[in-house]
Amino acid sequence: MKEFDLVKAKVDIENIQMGTEGVIVHIYEGHAAGEVEFFDENDDTIDVVTCKFEQLELINERR
């Protein structure tokens, strides 16, 4: 996974429900985790959450 890839939460993460979509906005050194901006069906930001990549499913890879 890379910055700006579109992802979906595979599990509930803090206040983010499983299935919620988001965009990776930062990747930490070591590439095991990153910051993801999650948004609702109106594309409004819900929250920015630190996630392990194992908690995320890649929807669309940025090229």
Task: Please provide the spans of the model-predicted regions.
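Basic/aromatic-rich interaction segments and small domains that mediate binding to polyanionic partners
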Residues: 2-62
